[in-house]
């Protein structure tokens, strides 16, 4: 038998194409914005809280990013808003990890799959395992009902794999 293709929950499905129309107005800015925010969310927690603003400004002002001062401020404000939000404090504090690979065997609607993924942040404590995975390509939903079902399936796959690794949490 042929091995199944690894399940990669963050890979876009057919219902949400990853190719942007060359006739669109975006010029790839939403992808650039997402990459920059992800990079800041990965690296800024390594700095003391009081240093994060200056480090973020230094990173975003690099000429290679080609960002206006206003766009730099917008991206940094959004990033720092996530980092300082009380609900996320542990995920950006001591002991948390960035860009963590997760592999495992998970059950899906079409049978058993090998999961191969990378989560943005992971925190393992004595009581729980917490994961945060950022979606910067769209405005955040205001209610749980507005969350794209694909993202719910993605997080469920992560939860199922992590339950196998950390069954008591």
Language model segments and positions:
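Structural signature of nuclease core domains in nucleic-acid processing machines
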Residues: 1-169
């Amino acid at each position: 038998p042929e091995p199944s293709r690894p399940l990669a929950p963050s890979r876009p499905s057919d219902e949400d194409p990853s190719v942007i129309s060359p006739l669109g107005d975006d010029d790839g800015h939403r992808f650039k914005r997402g990459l920059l925010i992800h990079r800041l969310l990965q690296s800024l927690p390594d700095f003391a809280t009081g240093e994060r603003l200056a480090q973020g400004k230094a990173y975003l002002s690099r000429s290679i990013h080609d960002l206006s001062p206003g766009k730099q401020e917008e991206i940094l404000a959004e990033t720092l808003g996530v980092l300082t939000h009380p609900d996320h404090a542990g995920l950006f504090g001591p002991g948390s990890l960035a860009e963590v690979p997760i592999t495992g065997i998970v059950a899906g609607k079409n049978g058993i799959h090998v999961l191969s993924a990378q989560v943005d942040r992971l925190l393992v404590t004595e009581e729980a395992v917490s994961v945060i995975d950022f979606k910067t390509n769209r405005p955040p939903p205001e209610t749980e009902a507005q969350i794209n079902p694909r993202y719910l399936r993605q997080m469920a796959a992560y939860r199922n794999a992590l339950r196998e690794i950390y069954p008591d949490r």
